[in-house]
Amino acid sequence: MAHGAKYRVPFRRRREGKTNFRLRLKLLLSRTPRLVARKSLNNIVAQIVEYDEVGDKIVVSAHSKEIVKLGYKGHCGNVPAAYLTGLLLGKKALKEGNEEAILDLGLNSATKGAAVLAILKGAVDAGMDIPHSEEILPGEDRINGSHVKEYAELLKVEDEEKYNKQFSKYLKNGLNPEDLPEHFEEIKEKILSL
């Protein structure tokens, strides 16, 4: 693997594709806690992290499974779930006394309307001070799940079998996908009342 005497082996986490150290250094030099937003296919994780020489210290954390405990019946990896997770994190952070942070997306790119940016919008709506641009955040129709509702209505008319397969978890949990925006508002009110 080495290419001569001057070859320098990259850091292990860089080789594994886990950490962008140039970006991490810029974030750490701000001396502000980071809002770490991560999304997998089925879950959302949001954390407020402070730098420590020994290792980063997680101050507050929220997981999309926590909104399920509050009664959320939808999919935990979509934009509405990301917003609710960010809102929950923001409420927890404010209770702990953390009012400001900067967004850390890791190796994710900041694509307009992405679910990781819905986490940011949720935290900002909870009352946190996080620098951002309004135009990159997802629209209100995507945050409350109206796009899911429209697709479900279209699919129910065109192909009932595909509708039942696509939204099987919603139906199993007792939620019609057409009712997602109302259900979203109900869970949002629960989180805001915490």
From Swiss-Prot:
<dbReference type="GO" id="GO:0006412">
    <property type="term" value="P:translation"/>
</dbReference>
<comment type="function">
    <text>This is one of the proteins that bind and probably mediate the attachment of the 5S RNA into the large ribosomal subunit, where it forms part of the central protuberance.</text>
</comment>
<dbReference type="GO" id="GO:0022625">
    <property type="term" value="C:cytosolic large ribosomal subunit"/>
</dbReference>
<keyword id="KW-0694">RNA-binding</keyword>
<dbReference type="InterPro" id="IPR005485">
    <property type="entry name" value="Rbsml_uL18_euk"/>
</dbReference>
<dbReference type="GO" id="GO:0008097">
    <property type="term" value="F:5S rRNA binding"/>
</dbReference>
<keyword id="KW-0687">Ribonucleoprotein</keyword>
<comment type="similarity">
    <text>Belongs to the universal ribosomal protein uL18 family.</text>
</comment>
<dbReference type="Pfam" id="PF17144">
    <property type="entry name" value="Ribosomal_L5e"/>
</dbReference>
<keyword id="KW-0699">rRNA-binding</keyword>
<dbReference type="GO" id="GO:0000027">
    <property type="term" value="P:ribosomal large subunit assembly"/>
</dbReference>
<comment type="subunit">
    <text>Part of the 50S ribosomal subunit. Contacts the 5S and 23S rRNAs.</text>
</comment>
<keyword id="KW-0689">Ribosomal protein</keyword>
<dbReference type="GO" id="GO:0003735">
    <property type="term" value="F:structural constituent of ribosome"/>
</dbReference>
<protein>
    <recommendedName>
        <fullName>Large ribosomal subunit protein uL18</fullName>
    </recommendedName>
</protein>
